[in-house]
């Protein structure tokens, strides 16, 4: 009899333990529900989208439309994209080279589409709002340190001397106007640098140009292109390297003013990149981004 009572007690104890476990398991979701729930989209909404991200999204969206839209819409898209990529270059330091090259590509595409539509692409006008510049007339300040300005001046002067030689040899794409513009930009940049520590040289090694005034092998890509096109691309890459390593001058004025000043430099370099395309340098990513990767 005692054994039977003991067995019943053990059974009841086991049942109580099992019941307690079941209740505890049922309460776990309720306990979890008492913690702060994650509101869908909360983290996303708390992320502050930067001006750089907004500009980059706008530029890439324009590129996408340019790939898929009908011809007229493509023209409008690449025209808009050209401006958007310059904004990216101005406010996203880590995307400066990409922004300049993409803008030049977009402008070159716009020019080609304009030709197909028998219209005129006007981004090359000489006013301060143009997307391309060849010189810095009227510019009195740039948000760059003097060392960077001196290296930009050297690149312009080197290109000017090379273009002068090619123009004298009647090389395709080479003109004295291009040479004069490069030399003028170099002088203007040195003036902005205070005319101290001038890196420009009276003579440059032009033996390769003398031997190959019409076409040459681009040392950056191994591709054959017009010598005048390679001169413009070399100038572009030299200036991109200088800007990528640039320090900023002491802040003077508001951020909007500095952005506008930076756009002036960006449009100068964009102009050289575009001119390289116009002279026959390949405008595809396989060429231009292979070149920048070696800088």
How should each PLM-predicted stretch be described?
Residues 2-4, 34-295:
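All-alpha RGS (Regulator of G-protein Signaling) helical domain and cognate RGS-like helical scaffolds
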Residues 1-34:
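Sec-dependent bacterial lipoprotein signal peptides
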């Amino acid at each position: 009899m005692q054994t039977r009572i003991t067995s019943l007690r053990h059974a009841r104890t086991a049942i109580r333990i099992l019941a307690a476990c079941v209740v505890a398991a049922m309460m776990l979701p309720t306990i979890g529900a008492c913690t702060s729930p994650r509101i869908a989209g909360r983290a996303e909404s708390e992320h502050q989208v930067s001006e750089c991200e907004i500009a980059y999204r706008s530029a890439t969206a324009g590129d996408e439309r340019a790939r898929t839209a009908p011809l007229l819409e493509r023209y409008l898209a690449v025209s808009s994209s050209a401006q958007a990529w310059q904004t990216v270059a101005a406010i996203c330091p880590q995307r400066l080279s990409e922004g300049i090259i993409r803008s030049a590509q977009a402008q070159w595409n716009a020019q080609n589409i304009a030709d197909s539509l028998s219209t005129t692409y006007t981004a090359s006008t000489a006013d301060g709002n143009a997307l391309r510049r060849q010189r810095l007339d009227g510019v009195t300040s740039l948000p760059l340190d003097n060392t960077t300005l001196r290296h930009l001046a050297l690149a312009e002067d080197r290109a000017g001397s090379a273009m002068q030689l090619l123009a004298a040899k009647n090389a395709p794409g080479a003109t004295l106007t291009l040479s004069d513009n490069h030399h003028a930009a170099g002088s203007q940049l040195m003036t902005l640098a205070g005319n101290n520590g001038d890196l420009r040289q009276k003579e440059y090694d032009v033996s390769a140009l003398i031997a190959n005034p019409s076409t040459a092998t681009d040392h950056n890509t191994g591709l054959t292109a017009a010598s005048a096109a390679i001169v413009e691309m070399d100038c572009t890459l030299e200036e991109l390297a200088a800007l990528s390593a640039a320090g900023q001058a002491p802040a003077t004025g508001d951020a909007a003013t500095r952005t506008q000043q930076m756009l002036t430099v960006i449009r100068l370099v964009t102009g050289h990149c575009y001119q390289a395309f116009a002279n026959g340098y390949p405008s595809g990513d396989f060429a231009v981004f292979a070149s920048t990767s070696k800088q």
